[in-house]
Regions:
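Peri-transmembrane interface segments
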Residues: 1-4, 212-270, 279-281
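Short, strongly hydrophobic transmembrane alpha-helices
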Residues: 2-26
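Juxtamembrane alpha-helical signal-transduction segment immediately C-terminal to a transmembrane helix
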Residues: 20-23, 27, 31, 249, ...
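Hydrophobic, regular-secondary-structure patches
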Residues: 22-91, 97-120
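Short, solvent-exposed hinge/capping segments at secondary-structure junctions
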Residues: 104, 126-141
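Basic-flanked hydrophobic alpha-helices used for secretion and membrane insertion
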Residues: 139-233
């Protein structure tokens, strides 16, 4: 009975290790797939400062690579928004037409449509968490007013509002990716963000998305070559580096779960070893009797294996 209980304990511990790690790997893959919706395979940002002008032969070289699916410019900033009298903060991300055509975010639209232009009217898609907080509805006619302090004008005590830049966009749709993204992100045309931030052709980053056939080796090759061509003035980050703290936390959690379950299995193994040791000590006189009758060590082992349950 002791041996059976010990064996069952070992089986349960091993099964728990396999099941829990499998479930965790599933969640890990799900989170990575969701994050890939809003994060590119590679992101080019300046080493110093917030914006740059994406020009030069390097960008032509990137565009010509067969493993590159799309390359788009983005301009991102924390802004103040107002919608029907409700105020709040948001992360406004201006994107170009390539993002509008190629982004997989349209698969996560929960209301309305993924559209950034309707004729000359600028539109925006908003995270469901932010939309819930601000009561934003793509079916309403109200626009979203976006404000940001002017970079070029000084604050006037007589008229402080003159130092605030403002634009207006209309909500076209709501998306839901994950809680952290949904509660703060809104996407709008990059030309409206450049107007708000008083930039001409400057962007905060260039997002590069690879084809489905591109593997990790190809991604690392591109990252290394782009970094070499652009030099120290720019950083080229993969998805892990873009969310280093999140992925490190997931890796540490997985390692911690693995170590805890391995520790449990080791304890169960010692329990089995102790149980068998006690069983042999208890049966040592029976073993001597069997040996006196001519039983070999092999036969005695078989007796313990067959009758030890």
């Amino acid at each position: 009975i002791i041996s059976a209980i010990s064996a069952i304990g070992m089986a349960i511990g091993t099964a728990a290790l396999i099941i829990i790690l499998s479930v965790y790997n599933g969640f890990d893959s799900l989170i990575r797939s969701m994050m890939s919706t809003v994060e590119p395979d590679l992101l080019i940002i300046p080493s110093t400062g917030k914006v740059f002008v994406p020009e030069g032969e390097t960008y032509d070289w990137i565009y010509d690579q067969p493993s590159v699916k799309s390359m788009c410019c983005v301009l991102q900033e924390q802004v103040f928004i107002n919608y029907d009298g409700k105020q709040g903060l948001a992360k406004a991300k201006g994107v170009d037409w390539v993002y509008e055509d190629e982004s997989s975010l349209k698969e996560y639209i929960t209301d309305g449509e993924f559209k950034l232009h309707r004729g000359d009217i600028p539109l925006a898609v908003v995270g469901s968490g932010l939309a819930y907080e601000m009561q934003i509805n793509p079916r309403f006619l109200s626009g979203i007013e976006i404000y940001f302090p002017s970079r070029t004008r000084k604050i006037s005590l007589a008229n402080p509002a003159s130092a605030i830049e403002a634009i207006k966009v209309w909500p076209a749709g709501l998306f839901s990716v994950n809680t952290d993204v949904d509660k703060e992100l809104m996407i709008l045309p990059i030309e409206k963000m450049q107007e708000l931030l008083e930039y001409d052709n400057e962007v905060s980053g260039v997002e590069i998305r690879l084809t489905d056939e591109a593997d990790t080796k190809e991604l690392k090759r591109l990252q290394k070559e782009i970094s070499r061509q652009l030099g120290p003035d720019f950083k080229v980050k993969d998805r892990f580096q873009q969310n280093e703290s999140l992925y490190k936390m997931m890796r540490y959690e997985k390692a911690a779960i693995y170590m805890i379950l391995i520790f449990v299995i080791i304890i169960i193994a010692f329990n089995i070893f102790g149980s068998l040791t006690m069983l042999i000590i208890e049966k040592r006189f029976d073993i001597e009797t069997l040996r006196s009758l001519g039983a070999t060590d092999k036969l005695i082992k078989r007796v313990f294996v067959l009758e030890g349950w």
